[in-house]
């Protein structure tokens, strides 16, 4: 039986095919992305540079001599490669288990194409089993938590974690996310919320799943 890490590697290696040469690209954060950076580094493909969404990804890119640039230095990105904690048939996602979802949304929105890579366990019919991360300013944490509770969720402060921007993460369990786009917007309207981990407005254009049968390329609502 193929291990989860092996499935992640299968998806990551396939994703290298979606990277155009001599372009700037965006790189996400997480264990699957670590496999992708390794595969890209070993592929011999030449890119102008990569915008990283986290320090860890940036350090790994540098290890493979892939130039790391700031989003402010480029006019746009050809493709954004990132993983997901959950992804549905419309390629809407929950992301942010690593706490970098604000940066990830910024870079995704600057990219012409979003390629999501994941092992097959992340492909779900409905979002919400994975806790939804919500980034909030510290002074509004209690207010934000009460609002999320009123929406039907069970908020839990991520203890001992501070985001890149110095904010806190509230992980919300048990939300009914039947309409991801609406839920994403409603949560972001709460005063004190910087961003939440629903990627419906910035859904993926392509999903590459690592499966027991190999890499499977999926487009929105293909099923």
Curated annotation (Swiss-Prot):
Is Isomerase set as a keyword in this record? yes
Task: Tell me which species this is from.
Answer: Neisseria gonorrhoeae (strain NCCP11945)
Key word Isomerase present in the record? yes
Q: Which domain of life is it from?
A: Bacteria
The enzyme's E.C. designation: 5.3.1.6
What biological process terms from GO does the record include? D-ribose metabolic process; pentose-phosphate shunt, non-oxidative branch
What keywords were assigned to this record? Isomerase
Q: Which PANTHER family match?
A: RIBOSE-5-PHOSPHATE ISOMERASE (PTHR11934:SF0)
Enumerate the residues binding substrate: 29-32, 82-85, 95-98, 122
What protein am I looking at? Ribose-5-phosphate isomerase A
Q: Tell me a GO cellular component.
A: cytosol
Instruction: Give the molecular function GO annotations.
Output: ribose-5-phosphate isomerase activity
Subunit structure and binding partners = Homodimer.
General function of this protein:
Catalyzes the reversible conversion of ribose-5-phosphate to ribulose 5-phosphate.
Under InterPro entries, the record lists: NagB/RpiA_transferase-like (IPR037171), Ribose5P_isomerase_typA_subgr (IPR020672), Ribose5P_isomerase_type_A (IPR004788)
Q: Which Gene3D superfamilies match?
A: 3.30.70.260, 3.40.50.1360
Q: In which pathway does it act?
A: Carbohydrate degradation; pentose phosphate pathway; D-ribose 5-phosphate from D-ribulose 5-phosphate (non-oxidative stage): step 1/1
CDD domains recorded: RPI_A (cd01398)
The catalytic site is made up of 104
Q: What class of enzyme is it?
A: isomerase
| Reactions catalysed | aldehydo-D-ribose 5-phosphate = D-ribulose 5-phosphate
UniProt family annotation: Belongs to the ribose 5-phosphate isomerase family.
């Amino acid at each position: 039986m193929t291990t989860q890490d092996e499935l992640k590697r299968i998806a990551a290696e396939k994703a290298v095919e979606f990277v155009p040469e001599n372009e700037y690209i965006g790189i996400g954060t997480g264990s699957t992305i670590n496999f992708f950076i390794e595969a890209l580094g070993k592929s011999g493909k030449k890119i102008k540079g990569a915008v990283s969404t986290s320090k860890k990804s940036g350090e790994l890119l540098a290890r493979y001599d892939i130039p790391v640039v700031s989003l402010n230095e480029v006019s746009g990105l050809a493709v954004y490669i990132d993983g997901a904690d959950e992804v549905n048939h419309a390629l809407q996602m929950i992301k942010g288990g690593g706490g970098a979802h604000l940066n990830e949304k910024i870079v995704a929105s600057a990219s012409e194409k979003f390629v999501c890579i994941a092992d097959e366990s992340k492909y779900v019919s409905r979002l919400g089993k994975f806790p939804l991360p919500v980034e909030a300013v510290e002074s509004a944490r209690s207010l934000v938590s009460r609002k999320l509770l009123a929406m039907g969720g069970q908020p839990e402060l991520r203890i001992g974690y501070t985001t890149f921007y110095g904010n806190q993460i509230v992980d919300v369990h048990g939300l009914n996310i039947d309409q991801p786009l609406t839920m994403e917007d409603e949560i972001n309207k709460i005063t004190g919320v910087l961003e939440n981990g629903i990627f419906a407005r910035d859904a993926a254009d392509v999903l590459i799943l690592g499966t027991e049968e190999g890499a499977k390329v999926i487009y929105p609502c293909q099923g």
